[in-house]
């Protein structure tokens, strides 16, 4: 089953000023992904992975490939440049078993993300908040973004 949703959280989660800067993805750009992959103990706090943008598809497709690890639970999580700008939102990884069955090899480092220009259309800001552009190390970027990341759990059941 594939699904997408815009989730409105009824509690006050602060917007990270850095995330209000959207940039277009460019092949070769460094990115980090923040999300809640896996099960059990990995749900206690978001994890961070890094990679690059490996391929940008045309604007009509609205997606790009990244080498940042995208696993179950990362879907809907942000991808940021190292200066804290939102470049996309992760949504899928290749089906490794299917790829193995069809191609005879296991793919690695191929996650999909939606381009930030499509996300920007959903989150139109009434006013622009000036943001000083600066490079961060991955640990400090993670700490700055952490208050704005929320875990959403969906329970599927009978109708």
Regions found by a protein language model. Give the residues of each.
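Conserved beta-strand residues within beta-sheet cores
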Residues: 30, 50, 67, 76, ...
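A residue-level detector for short acidic-glycine micro-motifs
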Residues: 55-56, 81
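Extracytoplasmic
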Residues: 1-4, 26, 48-53, 59-63, ...
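Conserved active-site neighborhood of the chymotrypsin/trypsin-like protease fold
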Residues: 1-43, 60-64, 119-120, 125-135, ...
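Catalytic nucleophile loop of clan PA
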Residues: 69-90
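C-terminal cap/linker of serine protease catalytic domains
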Residues: 13-16, 37-38, 86-159
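Short, well-ordered secondary-structure micro-motifs
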Residues: 43-46, 77, 100-101
């Amino acid at each position: 089953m594939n699904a997408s949703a815009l989730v409105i959280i009824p509690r006050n989660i602060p917007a990270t000023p850095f995330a209000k800067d959207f940039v277009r993805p460019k092949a070769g750009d460094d990115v980090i992904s923040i999300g809640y992959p896996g099960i059990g103990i990995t749900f206690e706090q978001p994890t961070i992975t890094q990679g690059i943008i490996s391929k940008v598809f045309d604007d009509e497709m609205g997606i790009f490939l990244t080498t940042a690890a995208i696993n179950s639970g990362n879907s809907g999580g942000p991808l940021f440049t190292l200066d804290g700008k939102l470049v996309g939102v992760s949504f899928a990884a290749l089906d490794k078993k299917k790829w193995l069955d069809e191609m005879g090899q296991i793919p690695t480092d191929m996650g999909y993300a939606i381009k930030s220009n499509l996300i920007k259309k959903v989150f139109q800001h009434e006013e622009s908040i000036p943001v000083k552009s600066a490079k961060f190390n991955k640990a400090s970027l993670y700490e700055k973004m952490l208050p704005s990341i929320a875990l959403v759990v969906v329970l599927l059941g009978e109708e």
